[in-house]
């Protein structure tokens, strides 16, 4: 896959369009990113009638699509036990749109 080469504003930033990339260092501590991860847990709880409690964001990856697909590894508490889950959230910030695409136990 090619880097953005023409007027997309991404040239020289190392962003690979369409490819899943590790987010910049420290992104797991970014408040907006944490809110998206909390959203993923809340959406999963609502859909699955679960009671997972967000603990922390462990890993963040992202993919530039029509918006941004965020790939999270999230530590949660379930009945007092800490567990890891993987979530995928699609966001189009300019439309105030976010949607949980996937939420599953980490492999």
Curated annotation (Swiss-Prot):
Protein's name in the database: Cysteine proteinase inhibitor
A biological process term (GO) from this entry: defense response
Family matches, as PROSITE patterns: CYSTATIN (PS00287)
InterPro entries tied to this protein: Cystatin, Cystatin_dom, Cystatin_sf, Prot_inh_cystat_CS
Task of the protein: Inhibits papain, ficin, cathepsin B and, to a lesser extent, chymopapain, but is inactive against bromelain. Inhibits the growth of pathogenic fungi. Regulated by the DOF transcription factors SAD (activator) and BPBF (repressor).
Annotated Pfam families: SQAPI
Family affiliation: Belongs to the cystatin family. Phytocystatin subfamily.
Gene transcribed to yield this protein: ICY
Motif (Secondary area of contact): 63-67
Keyword Flavoprotein: no
All residue ranges annotated as the Cystatin domain in the record: 18-107
GO molecular-function terms, A-Z: cysteine-type endopeptidase inhibitor activity
Induction statement: Up-regulated by dark and cold shock, anaerobiosis and upon seed imbibition. Repressed by gibberellic acid treatment in aleurones, but not in leaves. Not affected by abscisic acid treatment.
Gene3D superfamilies: 3.10.450.10
Source organism: Hordeum vulgare
Site location (Reactive site): 18
Tissue distribution: Expressed in embryos, developing endosperms, leaves, roots, flowers and pollen grains.
Key words, A-Z: Plant defense, Protease inhibitor, Thiol protease inhibitor
């Amino acid at each position: 896959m090619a880097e953005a080469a023409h007027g997309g504003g991404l040239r020289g930033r190392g962003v690979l369009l369409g490819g899943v990339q590790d987010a910049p260092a420290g992104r797991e501590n970014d408040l907006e990113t944490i809110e998206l991860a909390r959203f993923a847990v809340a959406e999963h709880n609502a859909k699955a009638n679960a009671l997972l409690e967000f603990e922390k964001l462990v890993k963040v990856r992202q993919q530039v699509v029509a918006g941004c697909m965020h790939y999270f590894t999230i530590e949660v508490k379930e009945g007092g036990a800490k567990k890891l889950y993987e979530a995928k959230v699609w966001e189009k910030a300019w439309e105030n749109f976010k949607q949980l695409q996937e939420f599953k136990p980490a492999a």
